[in-house]
Amino acid sequence: MRFVYFFFFILIIAGLSQFIRANPAQRPKVWFALGLSAWLASPYHLLFNLWPGWNMWSGYVKGLELTFVDMIAFAILASGIHKREPLRFRLAYLAYFLIVISSTFVSTVPSAAWLYVWQISRMALICIAITRSCADERAAKAIMFGMVLGMFYNALFGIVDHAKGALQSGGLMGHQNLLGLMSHFVALPALALVLGGSREKWLWLGPLGGLIIVVVGGSRATTGLALGAYALLFMLSSMQGWNSRKAMVSGLALIGLIVAAPLAVNTLNKRFEVQEKSDYDERAAFKRAASMMIADHPFGVGANQYTLVANVGGYSQRAGVVWNQGSRAANVHNIYYLYAAETGWLGALAFILLLANAGLLAFKHSWKRRNDWRAQMLLGLAVGIATTAVHSMYEWIMTTYTAQNLLAIDIGLIAGLSTQIKRSVASEARARRESGRTKIETGRAEELALTD
């Protein structure tokens, strides 16, 4: 049956790519669908597995999956939209890709490691498709529109869950930590556009949805980091220039804080009330297990198999991780320790460089044209990447395809928008030089005329 699904997958790609080629005016709808499906592919199972049978695997990738997001990305690339990706992005991703591939040679179960290679290949595909789409200035906001609606839709489900008595809600994502981490990729660039004065009404749903997720999620990391990121973004945006929109947002933010703070504190208090008091620190135990694994395997144990090695190798036992399914089947709650354990410190470093490269490039270009909406979005994307990088010190969920899809989209937007701004700045500089040259030539002509 999976081959039938794959056949239809190919047919849809062919039809959609032809539609994109033949209907340039309709392309924003395709970009919108890509942004929206990044939030809906997992909860509505808009995917199929080319290699089933991995459902009981202990790792975070459980097959050769293809999602609706991948289908749209394939169609965009097949439509013939051409645009070179910045070299620094290609090199950063290539380094990470090669290190992950090298981990397959030291893996206990090499085929499981190759599943993660497949997943990051899909991530690269999405990133390239977004970058090339940004050759059209309509693409970035269309993609952001889809992501904002997808996030807000999840936030509404969180409200419903909370109203029904759920202490913590993960919306449609299944877990509040995943929903909280994913919200950074969308809420912050949307807020940056709002602060910059963009007039699209739907943009307000971004920061509003992010605030709702903070309240209904009850996640300590999400609450602290999201509020800190909003404050940092507001400060940086104000440094770029003050306007009436920022004054209005500051007032609304104060009102929102007065309303939301008691709700968030109440959620956290209820969460801690039901938790049993104990001296056991599970996150610390996970980190001890990962540290021992890294010491024994400096080049890693293979992608997608931390939990296998942690249990079979006795690391969880020696680190004091309690004996139950939830704890022994969990990854270390720190993405950098997890990548270091699986792909070696080089793998962790390559991932850090991938994030740093994107964040720094976005921040750099956000100051080149401060009144340009593209620069404002880049500022939000930079803060979003930085916030996610810090959040990942307390979570492993960046390894899931749902989170990586949004990371790929944001990196693609950064690459595309940075290239646009770079070209605009170069074009303006060229125009100024030509204007100056024209004035000089005109002045010389006038001098000659007076001399004659």
Provide a role label for each language-model segment:
Residues 1-79, 100-107, 417:
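N-terminal signal-anchor transmembrane segment
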Residues 2-3, 14-16, 73-77, 97-105, ...:
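Alpha-helical transmembrane segments of multi-pass inner-membrane proteins
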Residues 30-39, 362-395, 410-414:
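Loop-to-helix entry and N-terminal half of a specific, functionally important transmembrane alpha helix
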Residues 354, 379-434:
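Transmembrane alpha-helices of multi-pass inner-membrane enzymes
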